[in-house]
Amino acid sequence: INSQSGKGGVAYILQRDFGFHLPRWTQIDFSRVIQQEAESRQTELTSDDVISVFENTYLNQSTLALQDYEIKNTAGAVSFTGSVRMGDDIIDVVGNGNGPLSAFINAISAKLNKNIHVINYAEHALTVENQSPLTQNNSDANAVAYLQLNIEGEIYSGIGTCSSTVSAMLKAALSALAQAQIADTEHH
């Protein structure tokens, strides 16, 4: 895969070799990442390089992590209470919404004082025969969620894996937020 390779090539490798079925909007986001990587290395990327960049971009971000959380559904109103590790700090977040994701986004949005909206969301089961080295050792990662967020007018994609679809979804939100933080520090 080189900097001229299309979105399809990268998405095909992730699907065939690792079981990730990237939605179109994630393909577009990731192909941009791969193109930058190929250009900075000035070399073609192998499928191992592709999964490594994929995992480092979306799955292994270490700036934000979900700690404990509780979701309550009371008469259709969903509340999220939990804590998120941000760098060295643990912050408590509380929010309400019409589902776990919107409650979490509202909680994070209020805590960070940022406008955050969900644009796209997709999820699927990770099939066992196509597991990346990252998920092989962690057979719990059998759900993957893809999320596209509008954060203060900028668009970011995030991906999360977990045994629980809800946790995968929340991790995807943190993955997108981490992309925003990285972009923020690069632009300032």
Where are these regions (language model features)?
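Terminal or standalone catalytic/regulatory effector modules within metabolic enzymes
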Residues: I1-H188
